[in-house]
From Swiss-Prot:
One of its GO terms (cellular component) is nucleus. The gene is ZNF501. It comes from Homo sapiens (Human). A zinc finger (C2H2-type) spans 22-44, 50-72, 78-100, 106-128, 134-156, 162-184, 190-212, 218-240, 246-268. Belongs to the krueppel C2H2-type zinc-finger protein family. This is Zinc finger protein 501.
């Protein structure tokens, strides 16, 4: 055997050694790359070495931190060729493209409902199982999604890590920040198919659509009267309870509705 053949065998042996699967001592899972095993083991240790300098959020992977930083910078490098909408990660773009294609590859075995995202199916299945695996250590409240637990925990800590670059207002959820930023940008991505009116929030569109359908979901337990909005039902309840939470600082008179207080205050202003 000549020297070149020996060298080739040695290289081949090193490649085989590199490809030899590494096993996690905690759960037995195998990985072809040592770096993948190292990242995986952080799940068991709870180790999150990559820290966001903006809000202090911690991550197991550098790539996850890089994606997270786009929340603060507003960077959206992945653009949809169909509608020009841009996204912070490639995975979110792929999921978004299914809106255009109508593809829903993830189907629930219980009820047949289909989803364009695997996490959406997993979350949905907990409706059938009633599973709530994420529990708050402060108050014991349990949640079906980890993100819901994270948001809830901020109610205990008062943490508001998502800050508006325009006005400095802070929020405990990234979704709330995104909705708020539309005040500055004027963006209204949710459009009514009936009349074309546009809204900054999907919930506002849903409420508006009830003006066309006549649907009234919120029913008074006292008199059976129905309302399109929860806020309108809450105001109506005050007729039965006698509650008048809006008080005039000028004369002490109280009102059920903020609008009634404003009208009253104009009387003082005209004195």
């Amino acid at each position: 055997m000549n020297s070149s053949q020996i060298s080739l065998r040695m290289k081949h042996g090193r490649v085989n050694m590199q490809k030899k699967p590494s096993k996690c001592s905690e759960c037995g899972k195998f990985f072809t790359q040592r770096s993948s095993l190292t990242q995986h083991q952080r799940i068991h240790r709870g180790e999150k070495p990559y820290v966001c300098s903006e809000c202090g959020s911690c991550f197991r992977k550098q790539s996850n931190l890089t994606q997270h930083l786009r929340i603060h910078t507003g960077e959206k490098p992945y653009k949809c060729n169909e509608c020009e909408k841009a996204f912070q990660t490639k995975a979110i773009l792929v999921q978004h493209l299914r809106i255009h294609t109508g593809e829903k590859p993830y189907k629930c075995n219980e009820c047949g409902k289909a989803f364009c995202q695997s996490p959406s199916l997993i979350k949905h299945q907990r409706i059938h199982t009633g599973e709530k695996p994420y529990k708050c250590t402060e108050c014991g409240k349990a949640f079906s999604q980890s993100i819901c637990l994270t948001r809830h925990q901020r109610s205990h800590s008062g943490d508001k890590p998502f800050k508006c670059n325009e006005c400095g207002k802070a929020f405990n959820q990234s979704a709330c920040l995104m909705q708020h930023q539309r005040i500055h940008s004027g963006e209204k991505p949710y459009t009514c198919t009936e009349c074309g009116k546009a809204f900054t929030q999907n919930s506002s569109l849903v409420e508006h659509e009830r003006t066309h359908t006549g649907e009234k979901l919120y029913k008074c337990s006292e008199c059976e009267k129905t309302f399109r909005k929860q806020a309108h039902l809450s105001e109506h309840y005050r007729i039965h309870t006698g509650e008048k939470p809006y008080e005039c600082v000028g004369c002490g008179k109280s009102f059920r509705h903020s609008s009634a207080l404003l009208r009253h205050q104009r009387l003082h202003a005209g004195e």
